[in-house]
Amino acid sequence: MNDTHRPYQRCTNCVMDTSDSAITFDEHGVCDFCNDFYQNIQPSWQDKLKDPDLLRRTAEQIKAASKGRKYDCIIGMSGGVDSSYLCYVAKELMGLNPLVYSVDTGWNLNVAVENIERIVKALDLDMYTEVVDWNEMKDLQLAFFKSQVPYQDMPQDHSIFAGLPNYAVKSGSQNVRTGANSDPACIRPPEVWVYLDDLKMIRDIHHKFGTRPLKTFPLCGMVKYRVYYPIFKGMKRVAPLDMVEYNKEKVKLFLQEHFGWQPYENKHYENVFTRFYEGYYLPHKFGYDKRKCYFSNEILAGTMTREEALAELEQPPYDPQQMEEDKAYIAKKLGLTAEEFQTIIDGENKTFRDYRNSWGLIQFGTVVLRALGVEKKKFR
């Protein structure tokens, strides 16, 4: 699915390349993602780091807003490095009493579950785990595979994207803490690789290929998430990792030493489905390697050199034997034979444009948010 109508080119600053068909380069060969980071994101991020009192003031504001409530905020927890460290920052550095929220989609590896348990126990936090109905998750994931789109992790992602704010409002928590931060997450995969959580498209794909109603599956549209919840329910999203020095490798060592936290191979590989989707399905079927985005973010953050990233990209995303085992496991768990699953993988590639979608509305909203200075990251 790479653009064969233009010569191959890789950014001279990061490792993004023309596998993103919309990428552009300046006269020095630097991509538009890098230029956007240096012009729009880095200045505001550095301003936050120059304000040592910002974290304390933010904590005081959250405590004031949550006065009289059992919890000061709610934190989405995956067991990964960002959300694990966020729990530490919230409890120990900000003095907050957060409720930890996790989602069991049926695919988490033991390392993720154990990491969550270690952090929650060590910090003496309360946790709520939402268990997604497996039959509904399975049906939606099968529908997505049959749709032939690249975004096979959308059913899982959406259950988390929707579940967290839905539960926050239901439980009366106005402050949602996120592990996202502007620095190492400014280059997100282009929409042809990983489309946004478009509820209209999710429903259309499920209508065409699903076999059972989604009665309990967590759902949340962009208008509800971006407008209704913040304006009418007072929900606020806060990103404390923007307010502290955040070197991911140092944070990993800190978590290991203090909590017995265990690392995993790559970003998001704490989940067997995501590991297979990002490490096998996307590269083999579409030619997309999300590590290019992850490594480019680390390059911009100063925690990885371009040479190190290029060397990593020469290696497979993870062990090829494990890929085949994951492939067989996922097919069996979804009720597919090996031949049926391979037929899906070999099928005609499609995108969100082949289904009903809200891309025009999402684009318009992004333009407005960027104009207002609310959104600084580059989307396409």
Give the location of each predicted region:
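Nucleotide-activated chemistry modules centered on ATP-dependent adenylation/adenylyltransferase
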Residues: 2-73, 89-380
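Short, glycine-rich nucleotide/cofactor-binding loops
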Residues: 73-82
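Hydrophobic positions on the alpha1 helix immediately C-terminal to the Walker A/P-loop
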Residues: 85-86
